[in-house]
Amino acid sequence: MKAIVVKPPKPGVEVRDLSQVIRHGSGTVKVRILENGICGSDREIVKGELTTARPPEGRDWLVLGHEALGIVEDSSDPRFKPGDLVMPINRRSYHGKCLNCLVGRPDFCEANEFVEAGMVGMDGFMVEYWYDDPKYLVKVPKDIADIAIVAQPLSDLEKSVEEILNVQRRFIWTCDDGTYNCRRSIVFGTGSTGILISLLLRTVGFEVYVANRRDPLESEAKITEEAGIIYYNYSKDGLDKLKSMGFDLVVDTTGASASLIGHEVEMLKPNGILGLFGFPSEGELTLRYDVIQRFIYKSNAIVGLINGQKPHFQQALAHLAQWKVVWPTVAKSLITRVVDVNNDKELLQVLNHKERGEIKVKIKWS
């Protein structure tokens, strides 16, 4: 059985023939892999840069991959039948000791005892087939099979938007018509995370800006134009203009210098919120006393955003179906490359390097 294997924390990746069966939880549903998605976390593991990555207990290797689309081959659970398309949930409860884990929300595990498929203590899904627990499988409509792999990263952002809206229920944040149409947001970063959360915010009803340090790529221009998103090059037009405009919501997806966050704080309107998705890779964050005073006086908030769960996968699939209808160009642009798992050269290339303009790269198994 072919699998893509890593040995964290060591760098490197290999295609290996496994003799053992990969089984998760009750393992009552047999799933054959159709395709995997690749994201930055996979590449960090391959390069030995993700310090939290670790194999399952008792061995030194780990099957990579937390984004997957598969087809059910056999099931003893009546909710799933052969031929069903499914996606597995990547973050799962380990001991199930805290209340959040007990009610299916290990994304809020208070004991910090969870596993993450293909990353932390649990084999991933870059493998020909595996046996899984139906609790952690989501059915996928066949009509969106071509873009369904995007549902995993999108699920994290579904939860992010939900969390932002929940925090903002501390006061009345909707407009006088009951919508969010009067609320202005800006997303820093135009990678896959930035593009996807921008699309979600437009779907919810926000006015949306996206910001980067360069002019938009052709693919970004097409997406932002169709979705009604405003692109802003802050290396050309500056950050001070954004501070003077003011935003109800600022989202950082850059994973760049922590110093940018200090500027983003100053862009918040009264009652505004800053969402941080991803981890700064360098720099320091220093806030002057007067900036902190204004932050307090304006009742601003900052929230960390990470990992969706099963309800968010379902929401993501519904939104992908919606986007195929209302934004067909956007939907077609979400998959930027497809690589055959048997093409070793291309496979190693996409597992090690992100391409310019990449949103989602798929590994095709069959």
Swiss-Prot record:
It comes from the Archaea. The keyword Cell wall biogenesis/degradation does not apply. NADP(+) binds at N212, R213, R214, F277, G278, F279, L305, I306, N307, K354. Zn(2+) binds at C39, H66, E67, Q152. GO terms for molecular function: D-glucose binding; glucose 1-dehydrogenase (NAD+) activity; glucose 1-dehydrogenase (NADP+) activity; NAD+ binding; NADP+ binding; zinc ion binding. Its EC number is 1.1.1.47. Keywords: Carbohydrate metabolism, Metal-binding, NAD, NADP, Nucleotide-binding, Oxidoreductase, Zinc. GO terms for biological process: non-phosphorylated glucose catabolic process; protein tetramerization. Substrate binds at S41, N90, E116, Q152, D156, N307. It holds the Pfam family Glu_dehyd_C. It catalyses: D-glucose + NAD(+) = D-glucono-1,5-lactone + NADH + H(+); D-glucose + NADP(+) = D-glucono-1,5-lactone + NADPH + H(+). Its cofactor is Zn(2+). It is an enzyme of class 1 (oxidoreductase). Belongs to the zinc-containing alcohol dehydrogenase family. Glucose 1-dehydrogenase subfamily. Catalyzes the NAD(P)(+)-dependent oxidation of D-glucose to D-gluconate via gluconolactone. Can utilize both NAD(+) and NADP(+) as electron acceptor. Is involved in the degradation of glucose through a non-phosphorylative variant of the Entner-Doudoroff pathway. This is Glucose 1-dehydrogenase 2.
